[in-house]
Regions:
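Conserved ABC transporter NBD signature motif
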Residues: 53, 59-73
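Hydrophobic anchor residue at the start of the ABC signature
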Residues: 138
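The feature captures the beta-strand-to-loop junction immediately N-terminal to the Walker
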Residues: 37-39
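Catalytic Walker B motif of ABC-type/P-loop ATPase nucleotide-binding domains
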Residues: 149-153
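Short, charged/small-residue-rich alpha-helical element at the C-terminal edge
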Residues: 220-289
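ABC transporter nucleotide-binding domain
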Residues: 167-251
Length: 289
């Protein structure tokens, strides 16, 4: 790994006696793209907040470029919730961020990133679609030319076309040496864009791996799905030891990629995840609730 630009050491966060982050340690090298995955409630957003100093860790240390605290002029953050002012036009928002950014992106560079139609720049931001708002919020983060990006569920609300455009921009940023840490529920995106994958589960860092290593593993997987997907299992050839209890159905497989593709084709979607429906990866277990 290249020289560490971010170092997290034994980070602990407790809230009202409950451990939210449990001794998290990892490093991110200059120019690396690191994905943080795990079910809702695993601690992804809290971890980012502690790294950025928005929340105070109970113990542990975070160093960015060897120093405590974030360098405001070098870091950009895309929050999980869009925070774009709704009563400004798109062109006005862009002009404002250009005004507060020294040597920022030009109007032409911004337009090349957004690929909006001419009339969309005249619209108020709240008139854009959810995906367009998300893309705009992301591009506004880039106007100051940060060298470190923190992105919390960056593609939430994006349609397929907008999401594809987003990852095209990410790939260009990677080529230019920008360091990126992002959280995601979209496993297919993680596999194609991340250099490393961190898996959080119940506040613990249970895996630090690479997409290649994750794909090459030939482990037996246990899959747990809501019982409403039980009829879909009849169409799956590569599963065994199927059991149904209460509101879930569980089975085993040695070909998780093929099985997951089939489930997606039958309507099982990661994008439907919420607090009660989430994707978790824990060792050899794939859990959808």
């Amino acid at each position: 790994m290249s020289e560490a630009i971010l170092q997290v050491t034994n980070l602990v966060k407790k809230i009202k006696g409950k451990t939210i982050l449990d001794h998290i340690s990892f490093e991110v090298g200059q120019g690396d793209c690191l994905a943080l995955i795990g079910p809702n409630g695993a601690g992804k957003t809290t971890l980012m907040s502690c790294i950025l100093g928005d929340k105070k860790a109970s113990s542990g240390q975070v160093l960015i470029k060897g120093k405590k605290g974030k360098a405001q002029d070098q870091i950009a953050v895309l929050l999980q919730e869009n925070t774009i002012p709704s009563q400004l036009r798109v062109k006005e928002l862009i002009a404002f961020f250009q005004d507060i950014s020294e040597n920022g992106l030009s109007k032409e560079e911004i337009q090349a990133l957004l690929q909006f139609k001419d009339d969309q720049y005249q619209q108020f931001a709240d008139k854009l679609s959810g995906g367009q708002k998300r893309l705009l919020a992301f591009v506004l983060c880039l106007i100051g030319k940060p060298d470190i990006l923190f992105l919390d569920e960056p593609t939430a609300g994006m349609d397929t076309t907008t999401r594809q455009r987003f990852w095209e921009i990410i790939n260009d940023l990677k080529k230019s040496g920008v360091t990126i840490l992002y959280s995601s529920h979209y496993i297919e995106e993680v596999e194609h864009t991340a250099d490393r994958i961190l898996v959080l589960h119940q506040g613990k860092l249970i895996r630090d791996t690479t997409p290649h290593a994750m794909r090459s593993e030939e482990k037996e997987k246990q899959v747990t799905l809501p019982s409403r997907f039980a009829p879909s299992l009849d169409k799956l050839a590569d599963i065994y030891d199927v059991t149904e209890k209460r509101d879930v159905v569980t089975f085993m497989t040695k070909d998780i990629e093929s099985v997951w593709s089939s489930l997606q084709a039958q309507g099982c979607r990661i994008s439907d995840i919420d607090n009660e429906n989430f994707l978790g990866l824990s060792g050899n277990c794939l859990l959808l609730r």
